Each structure stands twice: as structure tokens, then as C-alpha cells.
């Protein structure tokens, strides 16, 4: 019993040091503890090893053991993907990387510049889109994001694109206007996937962002950026645990090819 407790304490400290959110650590440890304390030590395993085995199983249960693909409509039907997230998470670059990835898989993607607030957001998307050889639909910054999204959707249908990726505005922090705008876009066209782009370096903050977006707008998956930095991976675990949504890709660097599938 004492050995089990010591091992559990070590696991708990390791998770907290990895920047996993406190709430998630608490829930996770409860699940592990319930199994560890009630279980006879399996032959050939010492209590410490047994705890590690349980932790491993619980982690797999939480994160899933499969990679998750973006669900795309068949054939020439247009799949609409709305990118959401805070400013500085790397949303615009990630939108272009995702378009490039889908293009390399034989899709015909169209990027739409729906961020009319941040100076140079449209230009940034155009530059990144060009690098990927993907067309960027823009109506300048005088139209509403909803109108731009609708225009892009019509354009995608007419020109036989089968994926439309909407680059929406980020804010420095979550506000009602931002959420409302995303909801308005969702109401105006058939958004298939809302993908949240989160900066993994923000650790605990990333979790709050994911939770709020999930509650307000609803998200279908997450892309974690800046995973090549000094991040300890805790954000991935916390976001999955709290939002219940899969992590689709991780951004591992600046290059457009650095968007990698997430392998739990």
C-alpha cells in the first residue's frame, strides 16, 4: 500500500510538471488510484511497476490509441472547415499548412480570408497560400466575415473545390463578439469541422481556451502549434481530457511541411 502511494505521488508530480492542468491531474489520479488500491499486485510486477502499467492503460484510454483523420465529404462535395483560435496561435499559417496537406492527398482546397480585423492577415494568408499552390478567396476587409464565408462557399461550389478552409479572426483574448461571429458563420453555411488552433506553449491557458470554445461554439478537433518549442506536452493531454475532442495535428516548426499528424 505504501509503495503504491509513493508511486502514485511520483506520477502526480510528473503530470503537474508536464503542465497538465490540475483539474485533469486530479481526475486522472483518482481513476488510477481506484484501480491501483483495489488490485492485487500481479505476479512478477512490483507495486511501482503495477502503478506504471495502470497509468499507461489510463493514458491510452484518455488519449485514444488511434490517430484521428479530418472527416471529409466524399467526391466533389465541399467540406467546410472553420479554423478558430486566439491571435498568435498560428491560425493563418496553420490554415495554409492544412490546405497544403489536403492538396498533397489529392484534394482541391480553397482558402478563404475571413479575418478582416488584423492588418495584413489577408496578405499573410495569400503569401502562405501561394507557397502551397492553393488559391485564396478574398473580398478585402470591408465586407463582413459572414459575407466573405458565404461568397467563398459559392465560389468553391462553382469552381469545383472540394475543401473550403475559413481563416477566421483571432482575438487577444476570448470575447463575446468573437464567439458570436463564429456562430454566425456556422449559421450561414454548413460548417463540417470547426478546428481549434491552440499554442501549446501556453500550457494551462490552452486548456481554458479549448474549454470555452467547446462550450460556446463547439469544436470537432484541435491542432496544437509550437510543439517544437519548450513545451512539455501537458496541453495535449489536458485539452483532450477536458474537451473530449481529438488532437488532429501538431505544428512542429515554421516550415509549411511541419504540420504532422498527432500520434497519441
Regions found by a protein language model. Give the residues of each.
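Primarily NTPase-proximal linker/entry elements flanking Walker-type ATP/GTP-binding cores
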Residues: 1-114, 121-141, 148-168
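Alpha-helical hydrophobic packing sites
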Residues: 21-23, 117, 169, 227-230, ...
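Alpha-helix N-cap/helix-start motif
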Residues: 91, 95, 121-122, 175-178, ...
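Short, small-residue-enriched loops and turns at beta-alpha junctions
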Residues: 88-89, 117-119, 143-145, 170-174, ...
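Conserved phosphate-handling catalytic cores of large alpha/beta enzymes
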Residues: 150, 161, 173, 180-187, ...
Amino acid at each position: 500500500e505504501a509503495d503504491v502511494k509513493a508511486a502514485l505521488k511520483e506520477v502526480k508530480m510528473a503530470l503537474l510538471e508536464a503542465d497538465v492542468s490540475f483539474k485533469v491531474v486530479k481526475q486522472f489520479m483518482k481513476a488510477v488510484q481506484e484501480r491501483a488500491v483495489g488490485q492485487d499486485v500481479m505476479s512478477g510486477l512490483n507495486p511501482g511497476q503495477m502503478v506504471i502499467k495502470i497509468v499507461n492503460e489510463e493514458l491510452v484510454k484518455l488519449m485514444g490509441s488511434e490517430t484521428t483523420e479530418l472527416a471529409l465529404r466524399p467526391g466533389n462535395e465541399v467540406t467546410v472547415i472553420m479554423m478558430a483560435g486566439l491571435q498568435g496561435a498560428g491560425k493563418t499559417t496553420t490554415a495554409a499548412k492544412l490546405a497544403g496537406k489536403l492538396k498533397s492527398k489529392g484534394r482541391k482546397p480553397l482558402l478563404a480570408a475571413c479575418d478582416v480585423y488584423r492588418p495584413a492577415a489577408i496578405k499573410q494568408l495569400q503569401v502562405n497560400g501561394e507557397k502551397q499552390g492553393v488559391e485564396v478567396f478574398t473580398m478585402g476587409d470591408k465586407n463582413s466575415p459572414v459575407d466573405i464565408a458565404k461568397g467563398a462557399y459559392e465560389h468553391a461550389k462553382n469552381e469545383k473545390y472540394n475543401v473550403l478552409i475559413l481563416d477566421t479572426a483571432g482575438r487577444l483574448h476570448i470575447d463575446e463578439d468573437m464567439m458570436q461571429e463564429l456562430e454566425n458563420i456556422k449559421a450561414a453555411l454548413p460548417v463540417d469541422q470547426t478546428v481549434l488552433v491552440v499554442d501549446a506553449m501556453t500550457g494551462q491557458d490552452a486548456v481554458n481556451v479549448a474549454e470555452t470554445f467547446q462550450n460556446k461554439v463547439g469544436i470537432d478537433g484541435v491542432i496544437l502549434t509550437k510543439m517544437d518549442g519548450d513545451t512539455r506536452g501537458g496541453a495535449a493531454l489536458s485539452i483532450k481530457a477536458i474537451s473530449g475532442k481529438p488532437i488532429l495535428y501538431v505544428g512542429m516548426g515554421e516550415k509549411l511541411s511541419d504540420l504532422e499528424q498527432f500520434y497519441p
